[in-house]
Curated annotation (Swiss-Prot):
GO terms for biological process: porphyrin-containing compound biosynthetic process. CDD domains: Radical_SAM (cd01335). Its cofactor is [4Fe-4S] cluster. It is found in: Cytoplasm. S-adenosyl-L-methionine 2 binds at G67, T68, Q126, R138, D162. The gene is hemW. PANTHER family: COPROPORPHYRINIGEN III OXIDASE (PTHR13932), RADICAL S-ADENOSYL METHIONINE DOMAIN-CONTAINING PROTEIN 1, MITOCHONDRIAL (PTHR13932:SF5). Probably acts as a heme chaperone, transferring heme to an unknown acceptor. Binds one molecule of heme per monomer, possibly covalently. Binds 1 [4Fe-4S] cluster. The cluster is coordinated with 3 cysteines and an exchangeable S-adenosyl-L-methionine. GO terms for cellular component: cytoplasm. This is Heme chaperone HemW. Belongs to the anaerobic coproporphyrinogen-III oxidase family. HemW subfamily. It comes from Buchnera aphidicola subsp. Schizaphis graminum (strain Sg). Its main location: cytoplasm. Disulfide bonds: none annotated.
């Protein structure tokens, strides 16, 4: 019998306080025209439509993302979590995360989130520098960011801080100061990533004064050194965690696990008992979604595409790639890719061991070139 991978649940909440110029996630600024109660009801109906694909499988993690899901009333989170638990099996040890904007953090409401089952919070600080916050169009200042982090510490030990580098006119000193502020509050996890300008975003067409490649490299080297000295282990390209506090939900993504995606524009990946992999994309048109048209697209992943999709995720992690896991997650014998593996080894991107493949420093540095081998 084919061994199914672990499975998670992603819930998309599409509204925001303000759409930032660099953001390419699907969201609406005006919350009022999407009734909160009705949207939660449709989320649950969307979930019900997917139940036939997962049968009785146990959910190992839940991630409530957006948008800004922390705009939800605590009563809405309570209802949503209660009703989800009626419909699916959730592990007693499941990690349940909600993303939050610092300006939405209210002690009582977030404490009630915790009472409803949320056991991990992810706070999108981005930077503690008020001038830089203005430049990236965030709606709060340094003082408000600090107050938010201080509040979340009172509510829950397990929390992540999102911090960015490579911001407009940002210096190395600015970068290290941000990280010093972050570790001061002892988060269990820090997501530290470079600002990237995605097509079809306002920042993409603006001529922003971003740090050059040499300065970005210095920021990365010095920042990683500081985080390591502060007790945070790098386990993924932009993820750093205290011991045993890696984000389980994201680890499942990167290990090519399964996940249901519910809500506007949510994506899903669900493996079937015969080894077939189904990809789902939910409707991003809010009016269609609120009229019950949840599923936009569903397709099977072709055999030839599975290796690329697997490696695109697993190579983000700083760990060896088990050959056994490749076969288990793709339902493909490793001999199917032996010529491509050979090419990657010849180019110095991979090392081949008896039970695993390991990316070299060169492979991590030129990850896109490594992945292209499996795309050709």
């Amino acid at each position: 019998m084919f061994k199914l991978p672990p499975i998670s649940l992603y819930i998309h909440i599409p509204w925001c306080i303000k759409k930032c110029g660099y953001c390419d996630f699907y969201s609406y600024v005006n919350k009022s025209f999407i009734p909160e109660k009705e949207y939660i009801d449709h989320l649950l109906k969307d979930l019900e439509k997917d139940l036939s694909l997962i049968k009785e499988r146990e959910i190992n993690s839940i991630f409530i993302g957006g948008g800004t899901p922390s705009l939800l009333k605590s009563s809405s989170i309570k209802k949503m979590m209660r009703e989800i638990k009626k419909r699916i099996n959730i592990s007693n040890t499941a990690e349940i995360t909600i993303e939050a904007n610092p300006t939405t953090l209210e002690y009582k409401r977030f404490f009630n989130y915790k009472k409803s089952g949320i056991n991990r919070f992810s706070i999108g600080v981005q930077t503690f520098n008020s001038d830089l916050l203005k430049k990236i169009e965030r709606t709060y200042n340094k003082r408000e960011a600090i107050l938010a982090v201080e509040e979340i510490k009172k509510i829950n030990k397990n929390f992540n801080l999102d911090i960015m580098y490579g911001l407009p006119n940002q210096s190395l000193k600015d970068v290290l100061l941000d990280l010093q502020y972050a570790v001061k509050y002892n988060p269990t996890h820090i997501s530290w990533y470079q600002l990237t300008l995605e097509p079809n975003t306002p920042f993409y067409v603006k001529k922003l004064n971003l740090p050059n490649e040499n300065n970005i490299f210095k920021m990365l080297v010095e920042g990683e050194k500081f985080l390591k000295q502060s007790g945070y282990k790098k386990y993924e390209i932009s993820s750093y965690a205290k011991l045993n506090y890696e984000c389980q939900h994201n680890l499942n993504y990167w290990n090519f696990g399964d996940y249901i995606g519910i809500g506007c524009s949510a994506h899903g990946k669900i493996t079937q008992i015969n080894g077939d992999i189904i990809r789902t994309i939910k409707n991003k048109n809010i009016n269609d979604f609120m009229n019950g048209k949840y599923l936009k697209h569903k397709n099977f992943v072709l055999k030839k595409d599975k290796p690329f999709e697997y490696f695109m995720n697993i190579f983000r992690l700083y760990k060896p790639v088990l050959k056994r896991q490749f076969e288990e997650r793709t339902n493909i014998n490793q001999n199917y890719i032996k010529e491509k593996i050979k090419k990657a080894i010849e180019k110095g991107y991979l090392k081949n061991k008896i039970d695993f493949w390991d990316t070299t420093k060169k492979g991590k540095m030129f990850l896109n070139s490594l992945l292209k081998i499996f795309l050709d």
